[in-house]
Amino acid sequence: AYRYFNNPKYLTAAQKTADYLEREIISKADYFSSTLDANCEDKEASLYAATAMYYLALISTGEEQQRYADLCLKASYFALSWYYLWDVPFAQGQMIGDNGLQTRGWGNVSVENNHIDVFIFEFGSVLNWLSKRYNEPRFHDFVQVISSSMRQLLPFENHMCGVAKTGYYP
């Protein structure tokens, strides 16, 4: 909003929010209850924190930029801990298993709801930026895993994912 409207009060509000996120969430690794459907730790809270710090780093310079980048990095590591690095062996007869779904690269939602989803939004861009900034190719590599994993449920002829119609994403 600061850049879009060229209004410094939006930057000040974002900086105060970042201070709060650092003090109450990131420094404590207390990514808790940031969704409407969970009252427990969840990856979404860390995604929000990482993304907020990413955008602040993009509009900052010098030590301030480094601070936001480091906070983004810390929140991103937590977020990544929720992403599957293996394929869950589904029991025979489960639709997603029968359709060959591979869970590697999918994010678990929360300990309360314990299901996978494709909730990522701009986190891929955040990870690619961190990869370049910190010379850490694993971030970029994992973005590729996440991206390819999400595309496996895109329906096409002879691969309708069990419930889909052409062009419909289940």
What are these regions (language model features)?
Residues A1-P170:
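Glycan-recognition and catalytic cores of secretory/periplasmic carbohydrate-active enzymes
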